[in-house]
Structure formats: structure tokens, C-alpha cells
């Protein structure tokens, strides 16, 4: 099993989990196709992490891309950056800029 992570990505975890659902339990080539047609920002980020995990597998263990399968996709919430927007009469309302930690684990297919 080979793992790749991306941390502190400026994508809301709730939206990133939607994109992660597209690639669960697929082969690596199918998952890359699914993510390349996704219009979500999280899809682009997950595709980069998936490519990194595949590169780790090819570099460290000489595993062929065709034999790899997406074993686990995890989207965890990162820190929340708090900003404020000015409102009328001296008030303010909070703006929460959420971040995500993306983890993709790939491995060889079960026979």
C-alpha cells in the first residue's frame, strides 16, 4: 500500500468528500478519468494526490499502474481560518475559511 497526502488545502471538507466519493473502490485509471471530468476544485486537488500516490508506488516498488486500485480516500477537516465581514451599524459577521487534509492510499488489486 502506498500513501500520499496533501494538507491545509483550501477546499471545504464537505465538498471534498463529494469528490472523494467519485473515486472510492475504483482502479487508478478509472479514478483518474472520473476526477479529470469533475468540475470541482476538490477533484483537481484529489487528482494531484492520486497521481502522487501512483508515482510513489511506481518509484518504490516498481508496481504497474494497471494493477493499482484505490483502497482508501480520506478527507479530514483542517484548521478553520476566521475572517470578518463588516455589517451595518458597526456590526460584523464571521466568515469561516475551511481547509482540508486529503489522504489517498493505493495498492494492488486483490485476486
From Swiss-Prot:
UniProt cross-references to HAMAP family, sorted A to Z: Ribosomal_uL22_B (MF_01331_B)
Gene Ontology cellular component terms for the protein in this record: cytosolic large ribosomal subunit
Function: This protein binds specifically to 23S rRNA; its binding is stimulated by other ribosomal proteins, e.g. L4, L17, and L20. It is important during the early stages of 50S assembly. It makes multiple contacts with different domains of the 23S rRNA in the assembled 50S subunit and ribosome. The globular domain of the protein is located near the polypeptide exit tunnel on the outside of the subunit, while an extended beta-hairpin is found that lines the wall of the exit tunnel in the center of the 70S ribosome.
Subunit-structure text: Part of the 50S ribosomal subunit.
Family: Belongs to the universal ribosomal protein uL22 family.
Organism in which the protein naturally occurs: Chlamydia abortus (strain DSM 27085 / S26/3) (Chlamydophila abortus)
Source organism, top-level taxon: Bacteria
Upper classification of the organism: Bacteria, Pseudomonadati, Chlamydiota, Chlamydiia, Chlamydiales
NCBIfam families from the UniProt entry: rplV_bact
GO biological process, one term: translation
GO MF term set: rRNA binding; structural constituent of ribosome
UniProt keywords, alphabetically: Ribonucleoprotein, Ribosomal protein, RNA-binding, rRNA-binding
Span of the signal peptide: none
Name assigned to this protein: Large ribosomal subunit protein uL22
A Pfam family this chain is assigned to: Ribosomal_L22
Amino acid at each position: 500500500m502506498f500513501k500520499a497526502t496533501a494538507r491545509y488545502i483550501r477546499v471545504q471538507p464537505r465538498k471534498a468528500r463529494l469528490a472523494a466519493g467519485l473515486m472510492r473502490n475504483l482502479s487508478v485509471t478509472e479514478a483518474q478519468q472520473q476526477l479529470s471530468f469533475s468540475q470541482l476544485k476538490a477533484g483537481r486537488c484529489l487528482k494531484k494526490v492520486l497521481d502522487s500516490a501512483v508515482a510513489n508506488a511506481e518509484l518504490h516498488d516498481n508496481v504497474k499502474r494497471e494493477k493499482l486500485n484505490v483502497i482508501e480516500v480520506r478527507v479530514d477537516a483542517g484548521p478553520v481560518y476566521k475572517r470578518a465581514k463588516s455589517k451595518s451599524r458597526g456590526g460584523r459577521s464571521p466568515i469561516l475559511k475551511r481547509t482540508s487534509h486529503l489522504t489517498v492510499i493505493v495498492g494492488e488489486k486483490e485476486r
